């Protein structure tokens, strides 16, 4: 590989690193909502997995309501939010990694970037 090609790859890698840092900052601001029980339980979190809010419909807190059901609904809403955050992160970070260009072919087979 020629010296100029290496310098070009280094510059491209540095630019991609800067783009990834900016994207990670943006992801910490993007909120997704996980829902379960037909909307009775909602979890709002960022794409960096910081939970912002948990909403539970008052009907689930009524006397005689099943505690285990409520726990299951909270867990399901949380898992739904995590899946949505992961999907959003993959989508947004895909725009950054599409800039790899020729560098993508230099990565080992099955190599996954850390995001």
UniProtKB/Swiss-Prot annotation:
Key words, A-Z: Cytoplasm, DNA-binding
Any one GO molecular-function label of the UniProt entry: DNA binding
Pfam families: YbaB_DNA_bd (PF02575)
A GO-annotated cellular component: cytosol
InterPro entries for the chain: YbaB-like_sf, YbaB/EbfC
Subcellular locations according to the entry: Cytoplasm, Nucleoid
Gene3D superfamilies the UniProt entry points to: Nucleoid-associated protein YbaB-like domain
Main location: cytoplasm
Domain of life: Bacteria
Record has Cytoplasm as a keyword: yes
Subunit structure: Homodimer.
Family: Belongs to the YbaB/EbfC family.
HAMAP family: DNA_YbaB_EbfC (MF_00274)
Primary role: Binds to DNA and alters its conformation. May be involved in regulation of gene expression, nucleoid organization and DNA protection.
Protein name as it appears in the record: Nucleoid-associated protein RSc1192
